[in-house]
Amino acid sequence: MTLLDQPHAPVAGTPGPPGPGRAGVRRRVASTPLLLAATLAALTFAVRSIGLARSFELWIDEMHYADLGASISRGEMPALADGPFFLHPPGFFLVGGAVIRLLDLQTGDSMDLVYDLRWLTSALGALSVALAFLLVRRVAGTWPAVWAAAVLVFEPFVLRNNSRVFLETPAAVAVLAGLLLLVRHLEGGDRGRPRLRLFLAGLLLGLAVLTKDVFAFYAVAPVLLAVVWRRTLPFRDARTVLLGMVVPYAAYLVLLWVTGYLGAWATAKADGFLRLVGAEQTTGFNAPGAPSLVERLLDQALHYSTSYVLLLLCPLAGLVAAASRRPGRRLVGLTAVVMGSLGAFLALFGTLEEHFGYPVVVAGITALAVAGAEVLDRRPSLRKATVVVSSVLLAAVAFLGVSLVTEDDDGFLRFSAWAATELPADARVGVTNDTSVRALRDDDRFGPWSTAEQLQENGAQYVLTVSLPTEQGYARARPELLDWLEDNGTPLFRDEGPTNGETVLWFVDRDALAAAAARGVGGPPPPPLDAGTAGEPVPEAGDGGTP
């Protein structure tokens, strides 16, 4: 028996639907897990391919991660403009570098490279859905697993992450694969070499941590809790898993020690940890001057309301699953309890950034499917109500997901295409947020000039602005510059999308700009940002967040 050929785990006490025809269909579907997993993965990839370029605006972190993969493809340490990069471990950068090398992708333009690598993260997202299906099927049965996978196919927050070059998607793939091996061991019924299986499970979980440190909460903490919670995982087994976990990161640390970078890594990790726990609030919703979390939730409710429901249900579903008699279900429940608790802590005290919601949603969906099966095991009379509620939630998720992937949100891509043919060769353009600075840095016409004084000093008569980040305090420009441009500038290009609001290229008269510079419109020049890599501030830096 292979890892994927796992027996169907029926929901005890739940009557099947009447009629031999439907029962036969159910049996045939349940007996072909590989085919069903592959079908769900193909559907996932197809849905993500719809809006991969046009429905998800460019983020600066994507360009950093793409460039880090490019540096590895050249045989270098992961590095940005200011030196080797240590804020995040190199797991995904190794994968990205291998793909760049294998497919001979061009790395000269970071923006183009991002859109190439989005196909990689979409493929990994499809793999994660297949793994989630197999995981839930192992402990809860085929139909709860199909429901969980279908929710993951369309869930807006999952789509948002799978469709961008973010670290969370590959990390989740490793976690789900490791949990699948662990659950297979806990549920029994398989012959073979259990020590090797446990070690491989730990190795996969360790690869998740090697991709993003914060995934230690998803990969390591549930294993530790499983030892003490109703003896879900025997200590001897946990020891083997933990041994496998430490191998990837230990190899990374040895490499840093040999190359002399261990001290720089420790500094970057210490800074990232202080940000994570809230001791230093420089990013996220709890940072000074950041928009209110409540306001942001209300603004995004049209797109992500089901995501918020799943975030709230995550720890509750985890508690239900963790109370099961079956150890595999308890382990899945513990992952949701840990991730839901982490999300609550970050929202209240730590550095909460939107992409942190992705692993919480994934853990919540898998636990919710398992919790539903657990409830039906104990209360079969609730079957009809469970089917109705789960169907309504799935329908709402699908509606929002389809709306998201069919919506236009590609202002920078459209501006880049427009500028290639319409912008004069001798134009001087001030760009006013970090993403545009990074995307356009190789074009001599553009520069990080976001005040009237900077624009005048550099002979710029064009200004590229993004309204929503500027109004929220996330751009290099201040809202007063945007107000001044509304009154004194001439818009030459305008695009509207949910991420940036209005992306506008303005033309300004030299005399009006000189008068504005004399009055100090836009305030003093913004300080450079710390890239969180080698500690040197660089103007185009962006990833100064948490590990």
Residue ranges of predicted features:
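Signature aromatic-anchored transmembrane alpha helix within multi-pass, membrane-resident enzymes
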Residues: 38-41, 246, 327, 366, ...
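Transmembrane-helix motifs of polytopic, lipid-linked glycan transferases
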Residues: 42, 115-139, 177
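Catalytic lumenal/periplasmic loop and adjoining terminal transmembrane helix
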Residues: 391-503, 519-521
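Membrane-lumen/periplasm interface segments of specific transmembrane helices
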Residues: 237-286, 307
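Membrane-interface transmembrane helices that cradle and orient dolichyl/undecaprenyl
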Residues: 137-143, 178-198, 208, 322-324, ...
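Short acidic/glycine- and proline-prone juxtamembrane loop motifs at membrane-interface regions
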Residues: 59, 157-170, 353
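Hydrophobic, aromatic-rich transmembrane alpha-helices
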Residues: 42, 227, 305-329, 336, ...
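Perimembrane helix-loop-helix junctions
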Residues: 5-6, 181, 186-188, 194, ...
